[in-house]
Amino acid sequence: MSKLHIKKGDTVYVNAGEDKGKTGRVLKVLVKEGRAIVEGINMVSKSTKPNAKNPQGGIVKQEASIHISNLNPVDPKTGKATRIGRRKSSEGTLVRYSKKSGEEI
C-alpha cells in the first residue's frame, strides 16, 4: 500500500460520491482499510438501544468511513482541492506541501 496523503485533522474536499463538492475535517484515518472518517460527510442512520448516554435509544446519525481515493487535501492558501508532495525541510525532516501553491500543510 502506498503512503497516505491524508492525516487526522486535515481539511479535505470530497471529489466523488454522494457528498461530492463538500469539505470537512478528518476525524480518524483507518490505515489498513485505506479509509477515513470525515466530519459531516457520509452520514448514516444507526439504530441504538437505550443506554446511559441516550436513555430513549432510537435512530442516531453518525459519520461512516469514506475511501481516501475520494478525498483531496485542501490548499491552506487558496482553499481549493490540491495534490500533495513531500520535500525535505531545512531541519532534514519530510514535510507535506501543496502542489498548487507550494505552501506547507
Curated annotation (Swiss-Prot):
Region (Disordered): 67-105
Encoding gene, per UniProt annotation: rplX
Protein name listed in UniProt: Large ribosomal subunit protein uL24
Protein's UniProt keywords contain Endoplasmic reticulum: no
GO biological process: translation
UniProt xrefs under Pfam families: KOW (PF00467), ribosomal_L24 (PF17136)
Family: Belongs to the universal ribosomal protein uL24 family.
Gene3D superfamilies: 2.30.30.30
PANTHER family: MITOCHONDRIAL RIBOSOMAL PROTEIN L24 (PTHR12903)
One GO cellular component term: cytosolic large ribosomal subunit
Organism: Bacteroides thetaiotaomicron (strain ATCC 29148 / DSM 2079 / JCM 5827 / CCUG 10774 / NCTC 10582 / VPI-5482 / E50)
InterPro entries: KOW, Rib_uL2_dom2, Ribosomal_uL24, Ribosomal_uL24_KOW, Translation_prot_SH3-like_sf
